[in-house]
């Protein structure tokens, strides 16, 4: 048994960034030369952070080609290291590096995102922090979901959850308006925002605080009322004096977009969570009709 918990089997190469609860390094497995991502977790006084334990248990439960693989867990002194497969870059960095994404690549990335999500949701796991930075891609065109730090097993009936989830720009309106009971539709809203960002090459709703985020959504999609979204006026953060914006047609929001893409994104950005398309349903949408899915 190695005194360092097995850490000496890996050579750290460079720091990749900060995750939900610790630093992430690119490293090489000395014996095989395989590149890995090492996620270093600071152990709290009472042991392993609950977010880390959640990620470990969920990822071991969810082996799927569109979910980042967890190879190993190393315990070294007062630190825990998660050893993940390494991918070249994330979707955010890639989008920043190109003038535009070609329509077929958008379709492929969206399909793979939905595949990983449908699988996770099928295992009753919400991701809750979907954003381009958490979607890893490789040079072969594969896309995988990463950073399940906020992920949560869904219990039925829908439980009361914290609403401090998801980077503001990708946060579902029911969460922004203070709903504490929510389920898989929160992830589908985030997918709609990511899809829109790939189509327009800029974030769909880039608010700088919660009320700004709410207003940005309302300006684009219209201010919802009980006729559009039954029960919205009873949510804790809903205010009857919200400005009444009419909303814009989807072909104006996404001017260079094919009609089937507009139809799919409209189904993802439904205000009423129960009317929002599921990942499983979205995979069957005719938008993907011309995509060669044998690759996935």
From Swiss-Prot:
GO terms for molecular function: ATP binding; cyclin binding; cyclin-dependent protein serine/threonine kinase activity; protein serine kinase activity; RNA polymerase II CTD heptapeptide repeat kinase activity. It holds the Pfam family Pkinase. Its EC number is 2.7.11.22, 2.7.11.23. Phosphorylation at Thr-20 or Tyr-21 inactivates the enzyme, while phosphorylation at Thr-162 activates it. It comes from Dictyostelium discoideum (Social amoeba). Forms a stable but non-covalent complex with a regulatory subunit and with a cyclin. Residues 10-288 form the Protein kinase domain. This is Cyclin-dependent kinase 1. Belongs to the protein kinase superfamily. CMGC Ser/Thr protein kinase family. CDC2/CDKX subfamily. PANTHER family: CELL DIVISION PROTEIN KINASE, CYCLIN-DEPENDENT KINASE 2. GO terms for biological process: cell division; centromere clustering at the mitotic interphase nuclear envelope; G1/S transition of mitotic cell cycle; regulation of cell cycle; regulation of G2/M transition of mitotic cell cycle; regulation of gene expression; regulation of intermediate filament depolymerization; signal transduction. It catalyses: L-seryl-[protein] + ATP = O-phospho-L-seryl-[protein] + ADP + H(+); L-threonyl-[protein] + ATP = O-phospho-L-threonyl-[protein] + ADP + H(+); [DNA-directed RNA polymerase] + ATP = phospho-[DNA-directed RNA polymerase] + ADP + H(+). The modification Phosphothreonine is found at residues 20, 162. The keyword Zinc does not apply. The gene is cdk1. InterPro entries: CDK, Kinase-like_dom_sf, Prot_kinase_dom, Protein_kinase_ATP_BS, Ser/Thr_kinase_AS. One of its GO terms (cellular component) is cytoplasm.
């Amino acid at each position: 048994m190695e005194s360092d918990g097995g850490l000496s089997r890996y050579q750290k190469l460079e720091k990749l960034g900060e995750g939900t609860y610790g630093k992430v390094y690119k490293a090489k497995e000395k014996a095989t030369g395989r590149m890995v991502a090492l996620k270093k977790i600071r152990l709290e006084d009472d042991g392993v952070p609950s977010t880390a334990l959640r990620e470990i248990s969920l990822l071991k439960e969810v082996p799927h080609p569109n979910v980042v693989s967890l190879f190993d867990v190393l315990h070294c002194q007062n630190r825990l290291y998660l050893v993940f497969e390494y991918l070249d870059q994330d979707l955010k960095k890639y989008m920043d590096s190109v003038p535009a994404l070609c329509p077929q690549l958008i379709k492929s990335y969206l399909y793979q995102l939905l595949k990983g999500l449908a699988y996770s949701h099928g295992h009753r796991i919400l991701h809750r922090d979907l954003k381009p930075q958490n979607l890893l891609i490789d040079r072969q065109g594969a896309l995988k979901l990463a950073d399940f730090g906020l992920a949560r097993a869904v219990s039925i009936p829908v439980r009361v959850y914290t609403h401090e989830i998801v980077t503001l720009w990708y946060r579902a309106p029911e969460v922004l308006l203070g709903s504490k009971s929510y389920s898989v539709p929160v992830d589908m809203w985030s997918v709609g925002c990511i899809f829109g960002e790939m189509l327009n090459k800029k974030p769909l709703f880039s608010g700088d605080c919660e009320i700004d985020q709410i207003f940005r959504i309302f300006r684009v999609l219209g201010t919802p009322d009980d006729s559009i979204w039954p029960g919205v006026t009873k949510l804790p953060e809903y205010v009857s004096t919200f400005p009444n914006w009419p909303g814009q047609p989807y072909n104006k929001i996404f001017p260079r977009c094919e009609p089937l893409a507009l139809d799919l994104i409209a189904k993802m950005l439904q205000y009423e969570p129960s009317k929002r398309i599921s990942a499983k349903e979205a995979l069957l949408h005719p938008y993907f009709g011309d995509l060669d899915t044998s690759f996935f």
